[in-house]
Amino acid sequence: MKKSYVSAVALTAAAALVLSGCSAGGDEASVESTTIKVAYQKFGAFIQVDNHMKAMKEAFEAENEGLTVELVPIEGQENDYATKLALMNQSPATAPDVMYEDTFRVQSDSDAGYLAPLDEYTEGWSDWDSFYDNAKSAGLGSDGLTYGIPMGTDTRAIWYNKDLFAQAGLEVPFDPQTWEDVLDAAATIKAEIPDVMPLNVYSGKAQGEAASMQGFEMLLYGTSDSLYDADDQKWMTGSDGFVDSLGFIEDVYQGDLGPTPEQALDKNVGNLVLGEWLPQGELAMAVDGSWISGTWLETGTAPWPEWNDVMGQAAMPTQTGDAPGATSMSGGWTLAMGSGAQNKDAAWEFIALALNKDNAQSYDIAASQIAVRSDVSEDADYQAANPTFGFFSEIVKFTHFRPATSDYAQISSAITVAMESVMTGQQSPEEAAAVYDDTVIGIIGEDGTASVK
């Protein structure tokens, strides 16, 4: 059930925004502006944030006569968006007042001075009590201050086509206990329905965080190893789990169980997965996120009324079935305030409006997000809106989060390099892992790493 975009807070008549001085004339720096600049990602099938921001612009301007919200949708896949946003933030003339910020970049961007702390606002915001504590922590900087207000979170699992599984003689519901079960199912699909692509796992440099987090880390955290020792604050090298995770990628791509490397390295492969391969029955399994059904809703870019009848979900198993038996990865996005915002009160009021109870719920439903507000997650309309919400919320107990460090982005990039070298057959998993280890030591230094061997 769609909820209307209605403000639950009486917005103050915000004072006029002040333009950053960027011209040679000294008087220009003091010219008042009535515009709030809001930057966010818009790419392919991912239109939900764009729709939400358009609705929030209309609501904010209706309640704040004389103020204008300038929307700056940035076209680009996740890494491209981050690069373009960073370029905007480097100049006062282009830096946004409000920005759509990935939780894993909050620390690095706040350390870089791009973001403004929000604690003085959250302390007086009654809605803040409705946000789960672990969601709040996702918006913290390395200094312990709040820089981002969470919009929603997510988990990841295996989406599978029940009709194709039945056609291949595989049991439905699918309940893999080990990696081998997943690969065996893919091999069966290949043998029984050769025209169907068995399995997609995002991999390679072009996919950025979708590859490193959604592909590789979904595997690694199903082993006994991890990327980072949070207690000792050291990045791990020399782990068997790292090599084995690359081995899974090798099995998929060198074993013809997934897309060709050329297909997988296309920046638009995510749009193909959601808009064509899954709806058209060309792909049997995809390791993907809880949000993807939003593409198939009536409000999405590729409506597919039968999606819930056709698609099933299975938790990603641990490597050999060891406890807890399954694994997942969680992330999420926030709304953050630019450190250079000249009217921070107005920027905050936009954030508070966009993420109040009704508007957060409307966005979470449209974008198939796991709610981070208790009053949304407990709402009957939210619970009834998507038949997968229960499954994806249940696997939160198995989930893991990316290391919350300012240098994670560089490590993530090194992971995608290792994945690409293996998927294209240029290196063995052992060789690629060794190169990764050397790269991490080069980035962090010997003192910031530890070998498990």
Regions from the language model: what does each represent?
Residues 3-15, 19-112, 125, 362, ...:
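Conserved N-terminal structural module of periplasmic/extracytoplasmic solute-binding proteins
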Residues 65, 139, 314-315, 364-414, ...:
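Long, aromatic- and glycine/proline-rich binding clefts that accommodate carbohydrate-like moieties
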Residues 86, 95-97, 127-165, 197, ...:
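A structural signal for short loop-to-beta-strand junctions that line the ligand-binding cleft
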Residues 103-155, 212, 312-315, 381:
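Hinge/lid segment of periplasmic solute-binding proteins
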Residues 145-151, 156, 181-241, 274:
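Extracytoplasmic/periplasmic solute-binding protein
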Residues 166, 172, 191, 254, ...:
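Conserved C-terminal helix/tail region of periplasmic/extracytoplasmic solute-binding proteins
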Residues 168, 254-259, 299-367:
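Extracytoplasmic/periplasmic substrate-recognition and gating elements
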Residues 184-187, 231-267, 312, 316-319:
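Glycine-centered hinge/linker elements that transmit conformational signals in sensory
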